[in-house]
Each structure stands twice: as C-alpha cells, then as structure tokens.
Design a protein with these regions (language model features):
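Flexible, glycine-rich phosphate/dinucleotide-binding loops
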Residues: 40, 72, 139, 162, ...
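Substrate-binding cleft of extracellular glycoside hydrolase catalytic domains
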Residues: 1-120, 124-129
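Short beta-strand/turn micro-motifs composed of small residues
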Residues: 67, 134, 157
Length: 210
C-alpha cells in the first residue's frame, strides 16, 4: 500500500451527537458522512447528515459523503444517485462521494458492475469525484476488473492486513476497523486510512462543488 495521507472516520446517525473540534484535536483529518439510503423518500435521509456536515466544516475537517444503496438494477442505481445529488446540493467536499454497495452480494457480476457504473457516472456528470465502497470480496467477486481502474475504491477489510482484492494504487481508502475509539465520540467508530491526497487532487480538478 502507499503511505497514509489522512486519518478518516465514517459516520451515520448511529454515531449520535458529539464535538467535532474534539475529534479533530484527537488527530482525525477527515470524515465521510452518510447522506441517506435508497431512492428518494423523506424517511430515507440520514437525519444527522446536515448537522455532521456543518460541524465537520466548522472544525476544519475534510469532508466526503456516501449513500447506502439498495438498488438491484442499474435504473434504480441512477435514481439513488439522483437522490444523493439532491442531498448534497449546495455543498462542497474535499473527499470523494461514494455509492455504498453492500446489499447486492447475491446478484451477478454483470449486474453489480452495471449498477456501480450507472451510479458513479451519474455523480460524475454533476462534477463529482465518484467512488465505490464495499467489502473486499465484493470487489473481487462481483465487479469487473475495470472498475478499480475507473473509479476510486473505498474498501472494507477489518483485519490487520490491507485489502488485496484490487491493485494497491486503486485503493483510495481502507476501512480497517468498525470498533475504533475517538475522543469526543461515544461508542465504536468506523476507522479509515486514506492513501491519496484527495483534497489537493479534487481542488486541482475543481470537482465536488455542488
């Protein structure tokens, strides 16, 4: 793997309320926040997204976002991407914006590949640095080999050994723990290592300004 550039945590409403300034002081560089899940519906917005976004920005943390996807075909993956774009409108992000694909493990590689491409391409058409999140075996067994070359990968492998399911240069972020501890947050926290200088790259390309 490449050198670690940033220490990141990922968040959803389940992390509750906390002080982002304390989080930053503990050595965390950035956060990736869940926007919501599925196709557009009022109850499918993460009710901490706005609060977390404002708190992280005010604390000077780098911010990214992810949308939890339930789609089982490409047409619905596009609808989920459209929902995400509505939720991030008017915001800017220093880290990529991701589709989170964990519910599609029983589908074929062809269908999974088509869905990831449809979701990410929809985001890219709006000026996003788009990526895909999933567990390591999903990348290995359910996605075509060109996906890691085309989109940045955020790979979950909660072991001491970095993921080898995609080429090392394609792993932008490695989620290495679901049971981390961070000052200012009660309970377990998802922990991530970021291997690319996304803030610099995204700023240079003038992306993620919605």
């Amino acid at each position: 793997m490449n050198d670690i550039k940033l220490k990141v945590i990922d968040l959803s409403k389940w992390n509750g309320a906390f002080d982002f300034i304390t989080v930053k002081a503990s050595g965390i560089d950035g956060v990736i926040i869940r926007t919501g899940y599925g196709i557009k519906a009022p109850k499918q917005v993460d009710n901490r997204f706005e609060q977390y976004y404002k708190g992280a920005k005010a604390a000077g943390l780098y911010v990214g976002a992810y949308h939890y996807c339930y789609a089982k075909e490409a047409v619905n993956a596009v609808k989920e991407a459209e929902f995400m774009l509505e939720l991030i409108k008017g915001k800017s992000f220093e880290l990529p914006v991701y589709g989170d694909f964990e519910e599609q493990g029983k589908l074929s590689k062809t269908v999974c590949t088509e869905m990831v491409k449809a979701f990410c391409n929809k985001l890219e058409a709006s000026g996003a640095w788009a990526g895909v999140y999933s567990y390591d075996t999903f990348f290995k067994d359910k996605l075509a080999a060109d996906i890691p070359k085309r989109y940045t990968c955020w790979v979950a492998r909660v072991e001491n050994i970095p993921p080898k399911c995609v080429p090392a240069e394609s792993v932008g972020i490695w989620q290495y723990s679901w049971k981390g501890s961070v000052n200012g947050i009660k309970g377990n926290v998802d922990m991530d290592y970021c291997y690319k200088d996304f803030p610099m790259l995204i700023a240079r390309k003038k992306l993620n300004r919605f």
